[in-house]
């Protein structure tokens, strides 16, 4: 009956974990408040994890991205230091609506760092979109005629962080630039 009530209130994560929560409450002789707190915390944790996975999927990152914790700035040829990477990981630039531009020749780790920051942002609750410039131009050109492109453009516009890769490699017309 408890599971059905939790599902009625769309507390799906808590409903799924209810047997474990009840067993833990019995073993620890939890009060009603402690049990209710555990149920609600379980639901919040489940929703946050689901949101994180959904945001990761919607970001369209390239394969094999790594979290920033796995980065050793010395293995990158970008010249970024540990101190700079630490400041960027705090995401205060994102809270202040700032922009970052990583520029340089291929092979420096610009995409890897940008995607690592994007992953950090998703784990901190932000929405992120990753697109290569060539694909972004296609999306802009076809957004009015193709449903999928229009949907993707809408997601890009709503994202709190947009990562555009390979900007300098793709020529764009004035009309495309002003969309």
Indicate residue ranges for each PLM-predicted region:
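Conserved catalytic network of the ASCE P-loop NTPase/AAA+ motor domain
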Residues: 92-95, 120-123, 154-157, 162
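Interdomain "pre-motor" coupling segment immediately N-terminal to P-loop NTPase/helicase cores
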Residues: 3, 7, 11-64
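Pre-Walker A (pre-P-loop) alpha-helix and adjacent loop at the N terminus of AAA/AAA+ ATPase modules
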Residues: 65-100
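Short glycine-rich substrate-engagement loop in P-loop NTPases that contacts/grips substrate
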Residues: 77-86, 128-157
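Conserved post-Walker A coupling segment in P-loop NTPases
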Residues: 97-100, 117-120, 124-140
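Conserved nucleotide-sensing/catalytic segment adjacent to the nucleotide-binding pocket
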Residues: 147-179
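Walker A/P-loop nucleotide-binding motif
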Residues: 97-113
